[in-house]
Regions:
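Phosphate/pyrophosphate-binding loop motifs in nucleotide- or prenyl diphosphate-using proteins
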Residues: 1-168
Length: 168
């Protein structure tokens, strides 16, 4: 028997969180996860556009995995990282190192997105990362969300900005 992708349970404007709770489709948790999902798809486009030998492909893929972890945390309300999970703090340090290594004084300016399709997609992903971060701060008013998760989202947009400049 084939499993169907549709259930019809969402036809009335409700959807389920991972633990089964039914919520409105515009619930802040659903909205936030939708924004993060869009960012993840944009990062997938960026990775697909990058040359196969670009070392940033692996970092971007690892960021995609962390975004999926964040979505899971939001969907099941386990919004605090286990103390042994160092993946977020490690990635924050990694992003900060990349940003520091690739930032020069002449790069601090407003940038018109473009130059190449890859650079433009990176700038688009950067703007989506900022949208995600804003939705996550809204979510955090009513739900717990780990400080390291919030820090990662803040660094992510900076990283994408610098990466876009580097590939331009």
């Amino acid at each position: 028997m084939t499993m169907k992708i549709y259930t019809k349970r969402g036809d009335q404007g409700k959807t389920s969180l991972r633990h089964g709770e039914r919520v409105a489709k515009d619930d802040i948790r659903i909205e936030t996860n939708g924004q993060i999902d869009e960012l993840n798809a944009l990062l997938g486009i960026v990775v697909a556009l990058m040359p196969a030998d670009n070392p940033e492909r692996e970092r971007l893929h690892n960021l995609q995995l962390l975004l999926m972890k964040i979505m899971g945390m939001i969907a099941d309300s386990s919004n605090v990282l286990p103390s042994e999970d160092k993946s977020f703090s490690s990635m924050i340090v990694d992003l900060e190192h990349y940003i520091d290594e690739n930032t020069s004084k002449d790069r601090f300016c407003f940038v018109v997105p473009g130059g190449s399709l890859l650079a433009a997609q990176l700038q688009f992903a950067r703007t989506k990362a900022r949208t995600c971060e804003r939705r996550m701060w809204t979510l955090r008013r009513d739900y717990t969300l780990d400080d390291e998760v919030m820090s990662l989202m803040n660094r992510l947009s900076d990283y994408l900005f610098i990466l876009a400049l580097c590939v331009q």
